Amino acid sequence: LNVFHWHLTEDQGWRMPIKKFPKLSSVSAYRKETLIGHYNDKPHKFDGVKYGGYYELNEIEDVIRYASDRYVTVIPEIEMPGHATAALSAYPGLSCSGGPHETETVWGIHKEVFCAGNEDTFHFLEQILEEVSTIFPGPYIHIGGDECPKKRWSECEKCQKRIKDENLKNEDELQSYFIKRIEKVLLKFNKRLIGWDEILEGGLAPNAVVHSWRGMDGGIEAANAGHEVIMSPTTNVYFCLLYTSDAADEMDG
């Protein structure tokens, strides 16, 4: 293995400092408590303990240096437009609803996403990606793109205006518009975009690398369209798969 995919942001926490947006460290990096056990265990139980923290810049640089010495490329993942609740807890004005929001305490898909009709969203993300690009020397940045529910967009005046102004057909094409704009940002910083296979929906960004996780079909479709592909289907390579008959041996999640 010669690549380390470092998932640094999620609904449940933001794990790297961004100088221009300090609340990503002071607010988004923390959640009030954590789910105990498995997501499917109902009713949910929580530990009641505030949890959080983030990697200091020097720690990130140490990881990059350690990896480089061993010929390993580090690819950071900064999630968008979904899996963004932690970021939106600090900057709620970038959501469609305006908040308030809290960093999530359970796993899964959550309804709050970056507002695709708000120009401030793209300005915010461009500044973040500029900092990330200066820290990570590798050629790729992973932007997530997975599990983005469209309900907020369907109800948002700004997002619906964006769909109309850009002659888009629906919210799937709005996500494609979002990803394509982010790809242009990354190209300015000499980075290639990687996204989970949901970025195929609504139209694929021209130079995107597709990370296929929901089986093989998305990767095959992208490869047939001439795109580079990373295959990591859940059926074969997820560590949380149950390999024994004892459910207690399964990893939490």
Could you tell me what each predicted segment is?
Residues 4-6, 76, 141, 193-195, ...:
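Hydrophobic faces of well-ordered beta-strands that scaffold small-molecule active sites
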Residues 83-85, 142-148, 198-205, 236-239:
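A glycine-rich phosphate-binding loop feature that marks nucleotide/adenosyl-phosphate handling sites
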Residues 176-177, 181-198, 214, 234-235, ...:
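Glycine-rich, Lys/Arg-enriched anion-binding loops that position phosphate/diphosphate groups
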Residues 243-250:
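Conserved small/polar residues in nucleotide/adenosyl-binding loops
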